[in-house]
Amino acid sequence: MMMLIRCISIFLLFGFVNALIDEASCPIGWQIASDQCVRIVIAPANLKHSKKYCHHEGGELMDTSVTLLLEDVMDLLKNLHENGLSEPTFHVGGMGQALNRTEDGNYKIITINPSSHFPFICSLNKMARRSLLFQQKLLPVGAPQISLTGQSEIYFHPRHDADYIALPCTVQGNPKPTVAWYKNDVEVLSPSMSNVSYLLSGGNLLVPASSTLAYSSFHCTARNSLGEVRSPPILLKPSFIDPFRPHRLDVYSLATGGAKLDCDAPAHQPKSLTYSWLYGSSTDRILSQNERKFISLDGTLFFSYVTAEDEDSYACSLSVYSTQSGHYGPFFRLISSTPKLVNSTFPPKLDSTQPQIFPEDPKVGDSIYLECFAYASPLPQYKWSRVDGKPIPARSHISNYGRVLKIEKVNYGDAGKYKCVAMNAFGSAAGEVHVKLRAPPSILQGLHDRLVPTESNVSFECLLSNADSYSSVEWFKDAKPIVPLLLPAEKRKRLKIDHNVLHLKFADETDSGVYQCVASNDVGSSSSSALLTVKDSAPVFPPNAMSRKVFAAFGSTVSIPCIFEASPRFHGKWADAGGSKLPQKGRIRDEEGVISIEKVLHEDAGLFFCTAHNKLGKAHAQVQLIVVNKPSIKTNFLDEETVNMSCEVELTCENSAECPEALFEWKINDRPAKEYPSLKSKVHEKKSGHKGRHLKQKVDLEVPKSLAGSRQIGRFACSSLYGGSSEFVTKPQLPSPIALTVEQMDEDGKKKKMFRLRWRLPPQHRDTRDHSPKVEGYLVELRTRKNRKWRAAERQLVGNMEKDSITVENLLPNTEYQFRVRSVESAAIGEPSIPSDWVKTAPGAPSETIDNLKWRSLDSQTLLVEWQPIEIGQESSGDNLRYRVSWSEATVGKNATDDMKLSNQDDDFENHLDSDQPQAILKLNTTEGCRMVVLAVRPVNDQGNGSVGTDTIAFLNSHGELKKVSLHNVKPINASHVNISWTWDNTSDCDTKHAVQITCINLSGSEISATVASDRIFWMLGGLEAETAYDCDLKAIDNHGSFGPASKKFRIHTKQHPPSETPLIGKLMMKQMKDTYTTILEWSSIELQKPNRTENGCGYKIFIYISETATEAIELDMPLQRLSDRRNPSARLDGLKLMYMYTIKVAGYNPGGIGPISEPRSIRLGSPGTMDYTTGSSDVPIPSLLLLLLLLLWRL
């Protein structure tokens, strides 16, 4: 039996970092492609500068030899092209190589002049990827964001009764952002203010459908501690339809024999495409279209030729959906001017308006209609084609006897000229219509978060397509417009806006915040935002960022990065144990902060030092490299039933307790041993030598007969903390399937979410004389466009399996998949096949159900219903997702849920409406007294209906009684704030509640009030005067300003004034103790409490900031009772770390709150001038504050 032992070059990089960062993700500003991270840089450069840029970012020009990487990058480029990117050529790795877009939309590698300027593509190596991910942890996360709806205009029908318009504002961030709304740039509603004219529903705003809001502009903002963003404005436009003219003249047929009746529609908004015609002087007789009669989408009625029966009276009818009304015009007569031509024949002649397109200015994503009508006798046939020779889009279909070509969801590829030909036996006529598409501006590459040091230059670019280069671009900082002319002169010099690029010079900390660009045109807006953090910090090596010891196997290659936090950031410098800097070339070298040692030798072991410094300071870290022999594998065939394999590591440590566990891991045919439950392993450890300095660690693996039959086991690999080794036991390789194809399966004529994969094995495997192992099955792997990582198909996805095919089912609808297949036998898995082409599942009905269904009564006939939206951040299951709200009404006392019990669960209640937002406003029938409404919501789309979630019962009362509210508890917090909580009366479900109003009046008559939404049961009331009594009550209030019964009055007393004086820090020094050191802080005493008052709750607060620029402090209390000398207060700060920079502030406090905070004092412990060598003459003990545990928790 032949065996091959192979050494695997495995080196220990800091494994614990894996727990700190997600190495499967890409750093900010990079995109995942296959298993790598890439950046597509649009700014053109020559080959030299492209390489320099990629190298500066920690990467290199993309390697085109990796097939999966190349395919994924091509997909990214195709997406950019579809969004408007016109650049066809990109520099990639290799001398003079580039990716070039071909006429068929694919990309191929070409050779170009290296001095030519083109965009380029960088990819990150693993070390740089890890380093950037770690450095990225310095960036604050959770800046607010607003998900755009794409709506720039909303039409509404003004009403006198209560009706509302829902304006969407979906926000994200951590901490959760607060939402405020503005009307014409004036704030109208936020969580801290109330306005009975508006309702805040989650982040969405409900405004009354009043004519006073016509042409008003609304926008929302989202704000948290990191910054603020704003949405593009939404313009409210009233829907209306004017009356038709009362009279119109009769119409005569055309000389050709046909007829054209214009609708002569009145002014209306929005423009309607819904027309019909009445005839016979009756509003009950509606004209039907046929091969001879055609109603255009602009309302025109055409006759191919006129017969005697067509001489009748006609009237045009127009309806506008958003007004839920329509009008019809006066009746008039059609008179044939050429009766002799009734039975004549003539060739087709297109009307002067034909062909035409609807809507007239189509947008990307619209469904468009191309119309073509010709006068002719006999009736003509119609034929559609594209002038450029391309096929008609697959999303199109022809209707209305060939006269209408409809194209669903048009994209830029559908633009161009279309030709219509009308033909009969006597001739033909042709015409062309040009499809020009519009769209909101497309931001090809958005802004991304940045961390920069002070005095650096920063640029943000909203990269627009060439077609959008003339769009309007506005810039905002924390939701405020950036207008250079309105800025102070100093800042105006530093800031420059060049259309879609913002330049900021010599940045300082006041420039930190959320920057946002909004690109707009007459179609809509697009927006992108990013958080800029301007911060200086001295280099710090975070705990657990670098291992104190690195173990490397003899003969392997090891790389050790210098990982630290700093701003500004430079590469760390490595030196050996003697202090000599490592060279940049050679077997042992420093590659911009990364030690690289090739073919590790035993004499390479020892200490290495990394030094990081910037203008604020310097920091050091040391790493000990320990070289060990690679693990060895021994194979012992015990009998025909069992094989025993052992993997052994031998190393020497100063103390065996310091030798880390080897952490062995076995793999069989590249799959973890834990996937083979029949395997058994056992770990041994043996010590020898003085004090156990010599250590052997061994793991045994027992392989049973089921895997060891015929001694053809496969490949066994043992890896450990110190390296790895593997053993091949002779065995023919399993063949990889070839010629993989994918067939979409149909059932009952409907496309299902299932595919049939077919393949074949290579010819040599089918010849059993080569003693190839028997293939016992196949493993299907898949990935999606959105998640490009290969993974095994779950069991529920794999259906019927045959010799050379398999069914994959239960896939997500409307999702693109790629598949590959591996051969499998009992102890081995073969290499994967070449991936299949991308295939897309058919759209389907929504599979998610609605959660968190809530309701609120707006009045006795109006309900606001809200729920959690579905399909957030994922592919939509089908077209036109919306929500169907259905309800059933009943008076209290009748079981309203009987309707649901008697009906099919898949049926809706008798009343229902569809909403494209996760809320709806229901107008109910007028009913006296109390009633309950059973509500149900299901998601639906054009492909079908989803399932109904849990029903909810709402209660309404036509008498408008408001619930009674009662005080639960009141607790003064400080001199100006008090916490109030309450409960609602539950004796009746029908009493309504919209909000609660808190009203407090002091003895001098000064009033403070606050209105709080009904879903809150507590509120912190602020703005109160110190040491003042207030009489308060609670009342329910509805959205019309009507109040319910007041609660029983209660009195509150605010606390005293906080201290008014500011402490002064006198001494901040490091002091040597007997066995250690401490930090002494002294400050001036202030008056904390008025005379003759208790000292309970009085003292000083010490604020400790780790670094000069930290924004969050550790707060420590020093109660007055703990001070040994109240006239000269001081404290010992134990647990501070050497060489760390700390900033200290002090403030006094009493039950009324915290007083003014002192000026800061900073200290770097251990630096010259920070030691206090005096012994001191006083024996008064100084109270100590232990910080070590608190600091560790703060760092975590």
Swiss-Prot record:
Description of the deletion phenotype: RNAi-mediated knockdown results in truncated or shorter excretory canals, and also truncated ALM axons that fail to extend above the nerve ring, truncated PLM processes and abnormal VNC axon patterning.
Record-level GO cellular component terms: axon; cytoplasm; neuronal cell body; perikaryon; plasma membrane; side of membrane; synapse
Signal sequence residues: 1-19
UniProt KW keywords: Cell adhesion, Cell membrane, Cell projection, Cytoplasm, Disulfide bond, Glycoprotein, GPI-anchor, Immunoglobulin domain, Lipoprotein, Membrane, Neurogenesis, Repeat, Signal, Synapse, Transmembrane, Transmembrane helix
Tissue note: Expressed in neurons including the I1 and I3 pharyngeal interneurons, NSM and VNC motor neurons, HSN and CAN neurons, the ALM and PLM touch receptor neurons and other unidentified head neurons. Expressed in AVG interneurons. Also expressed in somatic muscles, the excretory canal, the excretory cell and the hypodermis.
Topology of the protein relative to the lipid bilayer: Lipid-anchor; GPI-anchor
Protein's recorded name: Contactin rig-6
All residue ranges annotated as the Fibronectin type-III domain in the record: 736-844, 849-961, 963-1057, 1064-1168
Stored PANTHER family: BASIGIN RELATED (PTHR10075), FASCICLIN-2 (PTHR10075:SF100)
GO BP of this protein: axon guidance; dendrite self-avoidance; determination of left/right asymmetry in nervous system; dorsal/ventral axon guidance; embryo development ending in birth or egg hatching; epithelial tube morphogenesis; homophilic cell adhesion via plasma membrane adhesion molecules; motor neuron axon guidance
Disulphide linkage map: 169-220, 263-316, 372-420, 462-517, 562-610, 653-718
GO molecular function: cell-cell adhesion mediator activity
Coiled coil residues, start to end: none
Gene: rig-6
Oligomeric form and interacting partners: Interacts with sax-7; the interaction establishes synaptic connections between neurons.
Predominant localisation class: membrane
Recorded superkingdom: Eukaryota
Residues bearing carbohydrate: 100, 195, 343, 457, 644, 895, 925, 945, 974, 979, 986, 1002, 1092
Entry's family note: Belongs to the immunoglobulin superfamily. Contactin family.
A Pfam family annotated for this UniProt entry: Ig_3
Subcellular location: Cell membrane; Perikaryon; Cell projection, Axon; Synapse
Lipid linkage positions (GPI-anchor amidated serine): 1177
Residues that make up the propeptide removed upon maturation: 1178-1196
InterPro entries, per database record: CTDL_fold, FN3_dom, FN3_sf, Ig-like_dom, Ig-like_dom_sf, Ig-like_fold, Ig_I-set, Ig_sub
Transmembrane segments: 1174-1194
Organism listed in the record: Caenorhabditis elegans
